[in-house]
Each structure stands twice: as C-alpha cells, then as structure tokens.
Amino acid sequence: MEYNTSALCDIYLDQVDVVEPMFSNFGGRASFAGQITTIKCFEDNSLIRETLEQDGLGRVLLIDGGGSLRKALIDAEIAAIAEENEWEGIVVYGCVREVDELEDMNLGIQALASIPVGAANQGIGELDVPVNFGGVSFLPEDYIYADNTGIILSPEPLNIDLELDDTVEE
C-alpha cells in the first residue's frame, strides 16, 4: 500500500508527531508504514539481526543508533532477513551500507546516511524501550508512516481510507 505523509498530515496534523527532516530513503519501497518495534543500540547490530529474524508482517523496526555516522547498522544481509520475514520497513537513526543492494529490496529503509564501515556484533542493545530522536518520542507499539517526504508517528493506526478518498476525489 502507498502512503502519502503530506496528505496524512493534512488530515491528522493534531494527532501525529512529525519527525524532523533528517532521513533519506535507501530501500526499494518509496513508502511504508506499520506498528513499531524499537531497538536502542550504538554501533552494534546483533539485536537488530535477532529481531528481524521474527515475523514482521505489519511492523516497522525503529532503531535508535545514537545518530552515529561512524558505522552502518543495516547492510544488505540484514535487510534481506527483514525482507524475507515480511517487515514493512526499517528506520535507522544512524547509517546503512551496501546501498545499491538495499534499493533493489521490497523493503522501506530510511536512515541518516550511508557509510561502508560495518557495525560490531557484541550483543549490546535494548529491545522495546522508549526512544527519542528527531524531536519525537517513540514508544513501542506506536504507528509510523514514512515516505520520501518525511516520517510521522501516531499512537493509533490512522484511517488510510480517508487519505485514499481525498486522492480519488481530486
């Protein structure tokens, strides 16, 4: 399904939080949405890999990587695990790598930047904890909507049919 964050903000601005504009799209999906699972980690992607091995249908993995621009938390191998387990997307407050392969995947991936250096695998990180970046506090089980224009967050799922109806009428 396609999502338009601009149209969603036109309808739900009082009900959503808008993440500061700092993310770029690296995945093969222009837009994605779902209920979030949060991870807080710094330059270590072992918990990310472990989490993405679970069923991700209807879910988005939101990673607070501390905004690190030194090591990539997502690479093609980890993204392929997410794609295989039907995750809708990944938002990384940090970096990705192997971007040419990421853009060919049926997966939404938003991140700050890309860098060729990979992350450590030391098992350090926290799962399903509140995280804060981009001027927004993210709670596990919130709903995220992302496209090339931006990222918005809602505590409840948004009625996408309203957005689709407005688009059809125009």
Curated annotation (Swiss-Prot):
It holds the Pfam family RraA-like. It is found in: Cytoplasm. Keywords: Cytoplasm. The keyword Protein biosynthesis does not apply. One of its GO terms (molecular function) is endoribonuclease inhibitor activity. SUPFAM superfamilies: RraA-like (SSF89562). Its main location: cytoplasm. GO terms for cellular component: cytoplasm. One of its GO terms (biological process) is regulation of RNA metabolic process. Globally modulates RNA abundance by binding to RNase E (Rne) and regulating its endonucleolytic activity. Can modulate Rne action in a substrate-dependent manner by altering the composition of the degradosome. Modulates RNA-binding and helicase activities of the degradosome. Homotrimer. Binds to both RNA-binding sites in the C-terminal region of Rne and to RhlB. Belongs to the RraA family. HAMAP family: RraA. This is Regulator of ribonuclease activity A. It comes from Vibrio parahaemolyticus serotype O3:K6 (strain RIMD 2210633).
